[in-house]
């Protein structure tokens, strides 16, 4: 039986790891043992930060919406409440984009939210649902 030598596969694995470690600082880029650890850690960071990116962007959108609604005399929470009561379902990413690029359209949404909030103060929920429909 022929002797199994693993030179080709291990060389390919090492090459793969070193390619992933390209651009790292110091021995992390060219020493296989250290490069392997650095690549594993970088993949952990990448996995974690893909989740964090979603949170960060949502927080950014909310801050932008809050700033834009304050210009119209409303807080973020009241604005979202007003939109929900008016039956307007636009996500925060689109609202943030509208606040920056289409201020007139955003102002119209704020006005609708204000109307829904004021209307609900003076009526019952059933009367509001029939008026909106």
Swiss-Prot record:
GO cellular component, one term: ribonucleoprotein complex
Domain of life assignment: Bacteria
HAMAP family, sorted: Ribosomal_bL20
NCBIfam families xref list: rplT_bact (TIGR01032)
Protein family according to the UniProt entry: Belongs to the bacterial ribosomal protein bL20 family.
PANTHER family, per the entry: 39S RIBOSOMAL PROTEIN L20 (PTHR10986)
Name this protein carries in UniProt: Large ribosomal subunit protein bL20
Protein source organism: Mesorhizobium japonicum (strain LMG 29417 / CECT 9101 / MAFF 303099) (Mesorhizobium loti (strain MAFF 303099))
Organism classification: Bacteria, Pseudomonadati, Pseudomonadota, Alphaproteobacteria, Hyphomicrobiales
Gene designation: rplT
């Amino acid at each position: 039986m022929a002797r199994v030598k693993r030179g080709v596969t291990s060389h390919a694995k090492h090459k793969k790891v070193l390619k992933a470690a390209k651009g790292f600082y110091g021995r992390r880029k060219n020493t296989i043992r250290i490069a392997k650890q650095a690549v594993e850690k970088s993949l952990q960071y990448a996995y974690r930060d893909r989740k964090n990116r979603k949170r960060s962007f949502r927080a950014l959108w909310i801050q932008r919406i809050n700033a834009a609604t304050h210009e119209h005399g409303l807080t973020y929470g009241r604005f979202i409440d007003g939109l929900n009561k008016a039956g307007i379902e636009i996500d925060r990413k689109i609202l943030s984009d509208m606040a920056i690029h289409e201020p007139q359209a955003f102002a119209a949404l704020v006005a609708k939210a204000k109307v829904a909030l004021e209307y609900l103060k003076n009526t019952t929920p059933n009367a509001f649902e029939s008026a909106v429909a």
